[in-house]
Amino acid sequence: MSRSLGLLIPLFAVGLLSLSLFIFWVLKSDQINLAVGANRFAECRTSNAFGGSNIGGEFELLNQAGQVVTDKDIFKEPTILYFGYTFCPDICPLDVYRNSEAVELLEAKKISATPVFVSIDPERDTPEVIDDFVKYHHPKMIGLTGSKDQVKHISKAYKTYYKAQQSNDDLYLVDHSTLTYLILPEYGFVEFFRRDKSAEEIANITACFVRNS
């Protein structure tokens, strides 16, 4: 029994060492990939978005046709992603219009991009409501909604904030963050845009990321 144990201990030690080396290699590879990505896009970046591997992730939602879609279905080309709600009286329409204009400017640069609108008001924003909204703003726009849990999941993944105001009717407002996100299929989240960025600036910055990807 003791002899068998004596043979197992070295084998266990070798296995533990191999596992440790593998974990080190994985972590080191991630660090290298992040560094390469940071250097690759250094000339394009206007925000403090490095470390973007912590932003974004997998999700499952409904599109404007009521179909179940995932992040892999949505992010097939450069994507300009925005979180808002269709009943928003002022900020959302302006931001969504600007993002749609940026997509048009990118098209003039021979760059295809997709504008995506994620609702943070799933109770009112059904697929039918979302469909009318996105058709009004841009023919390529994808609208996403879902259950409360699904919306909460993607909001948490992208570090967004939203909170519906207390109301006794359906005319309530929703407080929410207003960042726009740039997603590249090969890299995920790479940059964000604040409200003070113009459509021209968003298009130029996006084009820089695409050229360097």
For the regions a protein language model found, what residue spans apply to each?
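Short, acidic, Ser/Thr-enriched surface-loop or helix-capping motifs
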Residues: 63-64, 184
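Structural microenvironment flanking redox-active thiols in thiol-disulfide oxidoreductases
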Residues: 94-154
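Short active-site neighborhood of thiol/selenol oxidoreductases, capturing the structured segment around
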Residues: 69-95, 99
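Hydrophobic beta-strand anchors of alpha/beta hydrolase catalytic cores
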Residues: 80-81, 115, 180
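Residue-level signal for well-ordered, solvent-exposed loop/turn and beta-edge residues enriched
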Residues: 65-67, 188
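Thiol/disulfide oxidoreductase modules built on the thioredoxin-like
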Residues: 150-205
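N-terminal targeting signals for export/organelle localization
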Residues: 1-58, 212-213
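Short, small/polar residue-rich loop motifs at catalytic or cofactor-binding pockets
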Residues: 54-56, 78, 175-177
